[in-house]
Amino acid sequence: MSVFDSKFKGIHVYSEIGELESVLVHEPGREIDYITPARLDELLFSAILESHDARKEHKQFVAELKANDINVVELIDLVAETYDLASQEAKDKLIEEFLEDSEPVLSEEHKVVVRNFLKAKKTSRELVEIMMAGITKYDLGIEADHELIVDPMPNLYFTRDPFASVGNGVTIHYMRYKVRQRETLFSRFVFSNHPKLINTPWYYDPSLKLSIEGGDVFIYNNDTLVVGVSERTDLQTVTLLAKNIVANKECEFKRIVAINVPKWTNLMHLDTWLTMLDKDKFLYSPIANDVFKFWDYDLVNGGAEPQPVENGLPLEGLLQSIINKKPVLIPIAGEGASQMEIERETHFDGTNYLAIRPGVVIGYSRNEKTNAALEAAGIKVLPFHGNQLSLGMGNARCMSMPLSRKDVKW
């Protein structure tokens, strides 16, 4: 039985809010057990997660998605299914790329040992799990100076970032930090080999070596992409993306809007500052007000290489130019919140909700004031506990990549 249900016809995402049909997630595996205090900054975590509770919280998140009739695809299952369906050449290539990309860099001797260890796995799922989790000297039964022979990929539960669904295509990303760059191995593999994904157009490729991550990529409607200029995504990357989209005749977007946000390491993407939750409702952090800056790319009349043109509108005017109506702007923690309340709920990704249909969102229960403000604005909130998951610095949007949404009737 395929990880995809019978309704799935390929990547189809033309909004942030259309009814969610199919979504990619990843329950944190053994990889989070290899986070140590000395490596928190390097591995991009604010604290060590309590593994059992983190997995319990993620299961609650997935259960809420399934309760809303959403086809939930687990990343391990997708990669394992792709591996089973792939040619022997593609299987070998996956393992060789894993060995070449490994951190720490493997000696030739260790490459042989790790290759044999991986190929000895009895099931494709077991193989994928160990590739994601990291490999220790105890796994291999060898002597070495360090316990980890291959580092873990502990950020994989943030499935939003390695690639983004854009219309009927994808952008596969070059991620800012080395610890996350290895994650795109799995994105490249499934989109190159899975029968239901192999014909998906690519609008960006990690070989382009300019940083972009999925938390900065938004599809506001059929015409407009919105991309964050953030701690992880550069304006020159957006310019290259605009060029690629214009060159690809399968892509029909007419405009890209780039939005500058604070360059904070703990709030690293646009979706930690501003999100679209309904046809006219947007949630934002007031902390970003003095930093917001906007650029327009004209994909219709901007030539083969559209350039950014600074847009001097305020946030409200910019959003109105996209949705053609006055937007409702909801601040984190609600109107009249104290600076302390705004800072606390911004810190725990208070904008980072996942819309599962117009005006219905899922996110952490801990951001109580923001949840109340959304309910007061007519947004239905489906809360779940995320006290451990949030220590990885992401909320429901970060932990999900929509693969298919129904089109919105605007």
UniProtKB/Swiss-Prot annotation:
A Pfam short name: ADI
GO biological process, one term: arginine catabolic process to ornithine
Cellular component, GO annotation: cytoplasm
Pathway note: Amino-acid degradation; L-arginine degradation via ADI pathway; carbamoyl phosphate from L-arginine: step 1/2
Record InterPro entries: Arg_deiminase
Keyword Nucleus carried by entry: no
E.C. code: 3.5.3.6
Alphabetized GO MF terms: arginine deiminase activity
Class in the EC hierarchy, top level: hydrolase
Key words of the record: Arginine metabolism, Cytoplasm, Hydrolase
Catalytic activity entry: L-arginine + H2O = L-citrulline + NH4(+)
Active site: 398 (amidino-cysteine intermediate)
Compartment(s) where it occurs, according to its Swiss-Prot or TrEMBL record: Cytoplasm
Family named by the database record: Belongs to the arginine deiminase family.
Assembly and binders: Homodimer.
PANTHER family on file: ARGININE DEIMINASE
NCBIfam families in the record: arcA (TIGR01078)
Protein's UniProt name: Arginine deiminase
Organism: Mycoplasmopsis arginini (Mycoplasma arginini)
